[in-house]
Amino acid sequence: MADQPMIEMKNVTKVYDNGTVGLKNINLKINKGEFVVIVGLSGAGKSTLLRAINRLHDISEGDILIAGESITKTKGKNLRLMRRKIGMIFQSFNLVKRSSVLRNVSAGRLAYYPTWKTTFNLFTDEDKQRAYEALQSVGMAEKVYSRADELSGGQQQRVAIARVLTQRPEIILADEPTASLDPKTSRQVMEDLKMLNEKFDMTVVANLHSIELAKEFGHRVIGVRAGEIVYDGKMEDTPQSVFDNIYNGGKGKEED
């Protein structure tokens, strides 16, 4: 179906082993090509929601569909194949610090190989060319042979974005991608995500602390408080009072 959501969460609840409720009856549809930002207090459930989408956190109840197929019920090889469609960008960059930028970015292709091959990082010339082109796209080609630990935080995050581009997913989940960066670098990182969204029609879902960045880059905003969605609307139709309510109307709880 042409109007089938890229991501759909149906009555999703997440309860941790200690009894903490991370998500409470979440119902959400995100269409292909949207740039969605999720806002809320620290501990409101933003990261839990994002990580549930690709099953970094398994949910307790409900179902999550990726392009109409349940990721919740998928196992083994089929789960690995489904995760190819989903790229993840973390606050902590998740790079191999002692490896070169090229090798880190080439790792975006690992999902396309059997486990034995990924163990030895056996990348083809085509993989390396894809990686170089991805680095060009984010303005980092001159660092191709540098070690990851020689880069600034902003440069490392842009390398992480290039790695996702090399994967060629349909969905990008960005978990606080600018949290540890200065304002100028944060904007550069968001511009890179915007480029992936517009040039490659990738669906982007990003958790953001910065309301300014959320307003500038998001097509749609979702407000989360205490594990529940308390607002969902177009950014252009969202007044400041909505953000005030999301941040001042309730208290977050601790996440993993």
UniProtKB/Swiss-Prot annotation:
Record-listed ATP binding positions: 40-47
| The reaction(s) this protein catalyses | phosphonate(out) + ATP + H2O = phosphonate(in) + ADP + phosphate + H(+)
Q: Write the record's keywords in alphabetical order, separated by commas.
A: ATP-binding, Cell membrane, Membrane, Nucleotide-binding, Phosphonate transport, Translocase, Transport
Query: Which residue ranges does the record assign to the ABC transporter domain?
Result: 7-251
Do the record's keywords include Protein transport?
no
Give EC number(s), comma-separated. Answer: 7.3.2.2
- Respond yes or no to whether keyword Nucleotide-binding is given for this record: yes
Cite the PROSITE patterns for this sequence. ABC_TRANSPORTER_1, ABC_TRANSPORTER_2, PHNC
Report membrane topology. Peripheral membrane protein
SUPFAM superfamilies given for it? P-loop containing nucleoside triphosphate hydrolases
What GO molecular function terms would the record report? ABC-type phosphonate transporter activity; ATP binding; ATP hydrolysis activity
* An example Gene Ontology CC term for this record: plasma membrane
Q: Could you tell me where this protein is found in the cell?
A: Cell membrane
Q: State the Pfam families in the record.
A: ABC_tran
What is the annotated role of this protein in its UniProt record?
A: Part of the ABC transporter complex PhnCDE involved in phosphonates import. Responsible for energy coupling to the transport system.
The Swiss-Prot or TrEMBL record describes its family as follows: Belongs to the ABC transporter superfamily. Phosphonates importer (TC 3.A.1.9.1) family.
Assembly and interaction partners: The complex is composed of two ATP-binding proteins (PhnC), two transmembrane proteins (PhnE) and a solute-binding protein (PhnD).
What's the protein here called?
Phosphonates import ATP-binding protein PhnC
Q: Gene encoding this chain? A: phnC
